[in-house]
């Protein structure tokens, strides 16, 4: 027997359906009313940028002189304090001079005798009492005696061992009473001139050639009178206060490393720099007139390592765009293409965006580019 449904039940079904449809509509309205995510953006700008290269290096003394005896004898006295500053020509040691003083007196006597004989023969030659050959022999003997006298006098002077340069003297390797000899292998002490001081750094030849090409093509401009200026950072991270000057580059390339050595000279009045210290030298390369820097936090890389940024377009929608990075400059990347001046790139809220969605873009607070991004007046003029 077929069951007949109540008209009341039939009226309930459409009502329930209407309620369900109404609920779905409310959810769609709520979903469509969700505001776009907030993101922080950095507006790209192009400015002149002074490019620099940070190269590791070591300090080396401006002059180094080993003190050695030039005559043999017993060391009588040491006349300096180890580790002190000495001047050019300052006496450092005294070698027993008695033997050399006696040789000087003998040489002086021989010189006087030869001189008197030569003058006597000169008078006798006028009267033909001696031959011309005898006179010439006497004159040559006089000159020989004069040379022997000068050698003996120099040997006496060499008993006073003097500093060959001005600088700081190290420890003495001998004491009073020691026998020293002319030409001995061991030096008596070493004097090192510390002001100024050299800094030797190495640069790959490929980078040096690339820099030369960039300057020749006009992509980089010279920085002007300060092109050869070098600044220094010590091993503990502190900056050396006095600038240096690039003096020369080596004329050959090291075949084992493919690098060329550059030498800079720094004033060192307080002797803060000592030979053998590890340092970083900052060399100016040139000025790029329309450099574009992108904050590091704006760049992401895919599985292939290709860098990209999120760009906010004029309609506030976003798109991912690949860029080409050249080098780091402080906390930013210098790029060659991918974005242009005036475009906005996302630096905050990157995790909330995907391609094509609309965003609410505000100026980012986490962007703090390096001070070097703003060009100096001098760099702009060049």
Swiss-Prot record:
Pfam family, one: CusB_dom_1
Free-text function comment from the UniProt entry: The periplasmic linker protein component of an organic solvent efflux pump. Involved in export of a number of low log POW compounds including hexane (log POW 3.5), toluene (log POW 2.5) and dimethylphthalate (log POW 2.3). The solvent resistance phenotype has been postulated to depend on the operon expression level.
Disulfide bridge positions per record: none
Lipid attachment site numbers (S-diacylglycerol cysteine): 24
GO cellular-component term (any): plasma membrane
N-palmitoyl cysteine-type lipidated residues: 24
Bilayer topology: Lipid-anchor
Entry keywords, A to Z: Cell inner membrane, Cell membrane, Coiled coil, Lipoprotein, Membrane, Palmitate, Signal, Transport
Matches recorded under NCBIfam families: RND_mfp (TIGR01730)
Inducing factors: Low constitutive expression; the srpABC operon is further induced up to 17-fold by organic solvents (e.g. toluene and aliphatic solvents and alcohols) but not by antibiotics, heavy metals, pH, temperature, high NaCl or 60 mM acetic acid.
Origin species: Pseudomonas putida
UniProt-recorded Gene Ontology molecular function terms: transmembrane transporter activity
Ranges in coiled-coil conformation: 98-127
InterPro entries in the cross-refs: CusB-like_dom_1, CusB_D23, MFP_Efflux, RND_pump_MFP
Biological process per Gene Ontology, one example term: response to antibiotic
Family: Belongs to the membrane fusion protein (MFP) (TC 8.A.1) family.
PROSITE patterns the record matches: PROKAR_LIPOPROTEIN
Signal sequence residues: 1-23
Keyword Coiled coil among record annotations: yes
Cell compartments where the protein resides: Cell inner membrane
Stated name of the protein: Solvent efflux pump periplasmic linker SrpA
């Amino acid at each position: 027997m077929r069951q007949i449904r109540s008209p009341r039940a039939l009226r309930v079904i459409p009502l329930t359906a209407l309620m369900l449809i109404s609920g779905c509509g409310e959810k769609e309205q709520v979903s469509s009313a969700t505001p776009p995510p907030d993101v922080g953006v950095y507006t790209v700008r192009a400015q002149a940028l002074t490019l620099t290269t940070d190269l590791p290096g070591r300090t080396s003394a401006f002059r180094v002189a080993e003190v050695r005896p030039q005559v043999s004898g017993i060391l009588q006295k040491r006349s300096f304090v180890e580790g002190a500053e000495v001047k050019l020509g300052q006496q450092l040691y005294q070698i027993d001079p008695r033997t050399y003083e006696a040789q000087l007196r003998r040489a002086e006597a021989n010189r006087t005798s030869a001189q008197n004989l030569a003058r006597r023969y000169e008078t006798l030659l006028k009267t033909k009492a001696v031959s011309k050959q005898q006179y010439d022999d006497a004159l040559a003997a006089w000159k020989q005696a004069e040379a022997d006298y000068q050698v003996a006098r120099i040997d006496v002077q060499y008993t006073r061992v003097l500093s060959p340069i001005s600088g700081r003297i190290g420890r003495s390797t001998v004491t009073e009473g020691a026998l020293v000899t002319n030409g001995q292998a061991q030096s008596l002490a070493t004097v090192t001139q510390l002001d100024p001081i050299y800094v030797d750094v190495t640069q790959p030849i490929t980078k040096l050639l690339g820099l030369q090409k960039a300057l020749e093509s006009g992509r980089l401009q010279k920085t002007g009178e300060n092109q050869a200026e070098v600044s220094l950072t010590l091993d503990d991270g502190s900056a050396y206060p006095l600038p240096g000057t690039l003096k020369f580059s080596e004329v050959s390339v090291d075949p084992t490393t493919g690098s060329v050595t550059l030498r800079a000279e720094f004033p060192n009045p307080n002797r803060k720099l000592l030979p053998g210290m590890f340092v970083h030298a900052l060399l100016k390369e040139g000025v790029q007139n329309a450099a574009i820097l992108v904050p590091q936090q704006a760049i992401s890389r895919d599985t292939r390592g290709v860098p990209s940024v999120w760009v906010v377009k004029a309609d506030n929608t976003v798109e991912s765009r690949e860029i080409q990075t050249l080098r780091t400059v402080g906390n930013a990347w210098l790029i060659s293409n991918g974005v242009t001046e005036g475009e906005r790139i996302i630096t905050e809220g990157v995790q909330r965006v995907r391609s094509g969605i609309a965003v609410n873009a505000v100026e980012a607070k986490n962007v703090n580019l390096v001070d070097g991004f703003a060009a100096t007046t001098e760099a702009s003029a060049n």
